Amino acid sequence: GILVFLALYPAIDSITVWAQAPLTVPAVRPLVPTAVATADSLFFSMEPLASFRRLEARVDIAPNDYEARWRAARAALVLGVIEEDRERTDRWLRIAVQHASEALALQPDNVDAIAWLAAAKGRLATDIAGVREQVRLGQEVWALTQEALAIDRNHAFANSIFGKLN
């Protein structure tokens, strides 16, 4: 296993050896402050799945991390949009709704949280939902965008979502 590898191929420095060992939750805790920044870097490097996985690991360690939650919603939403298989699209979009809902529960007046939840529900309505669920989700998206725009009438993302409703 890993001990044989380390014994046969000694590392030049201790950092390399540490990186070769399996990471555990206690080992990852010191790296947590960089988790969101790393996830953003992965996301903007067109790697939404790697970003989502990093954020999911962060949420497992710190479920009340608002920043990780909304970013996980964003990554899952993009994964749902680019997925070609209908079942996997449905799963990703519902994961996006869940993370966005959790983010909103953590910061109920945060316009970004409201907008990401509206976007996730809106995409679910247009891509997956049946007629009844489309109507319900459409009403929820309308209410969420109204709530977001009441907080910040110039919020670009909320206005974009609202524009798609009309």
Regions found by a protein language model. Give the residues of each.
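Extreme N-terminal leader/anchor segments
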Residues: 5-67
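Short coil/linker segments at helix-helix boundaries
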Residues: 30-56, 72-109, 115-154, 161-166
